[in-house]
């Protein structure tokens, strides 16, 4: 019985969430890869004034005491999975989102700070 892509996809469609999670972990271990989306780190600005900027990078500098709430907000902002969002929060300081318009950046900063995080706009 030869395995082909259609058979593999059919098996994946029938698998439960727990089985799929185990599959992802096994693939990560077997091939030494990660399913996390890459997060680019912003380069330091060259003396630009914040008022003159029209887009900002949102940097999580610390998660604070309410880490679970911060992880939820990070997931909402980035669309990352739970594991990836937790790794991002645990690895602070990290850039959460890049190239955000000024108004949206302030809104997201307020949302993160309300959840208990320390945030800077770059």
From Swiss-Prot:
Report the NCBIfam families cross-referenced here: L12 (TIGR00855)
Q: Which family does it belong to?
A: Belongs to the bacterial ribosomal protein bL12 family.
- Write down what this protein is called: Large ribosomal subunit protein bL12
Q: What is the lineage of its organism?
A: Bacteria, Bacillati, Bacillota, Bacilli, Lactobacillales
Q: Which GO terms describe its molecular function?
A: mRNA binding; structural constituent of ribosome
GO annotation terms (biological process) = translation
A GO cellular component term found in this entry reads: cytosolic large ribosomal subunit
Q: How does it assemble?
A: Homodimer. Part of the ribosomal stalk of the 50S ribosomal subunit. Forms a multimeric L10(L12)X complex, where L10 forms an elongated spine to which 2 to 4 L12 dimers bind in a sequential fashion. Binds GTP-bound translation factors.
- What's the encoding gene here? rplL
Q: Which domain of life is it from?
A: Bacteria
The record's CDD domains line, in alphabetical order, gives:
Ribosomal_L7_L12
Briefly state the protein's biological role.
Forms part of the ribosomal stalk which helps the ribosome interact with GTP-bound translation factors. Is thus essential for accurate translation.
Keyword annotations: Ribonucleoprotein, Ribosomal protein
Report the InterPro entries cross-referenced here: Ribosomal_bL12, Ribosomal_bL12_C, Ribosomal_bL12_C/ClpS-like, Ribosomal_bL12_oligo, Ribosomal_bL12_oligo_N_sf
Organism of this sequence: Streptococcus sanguinis (strain SK36)
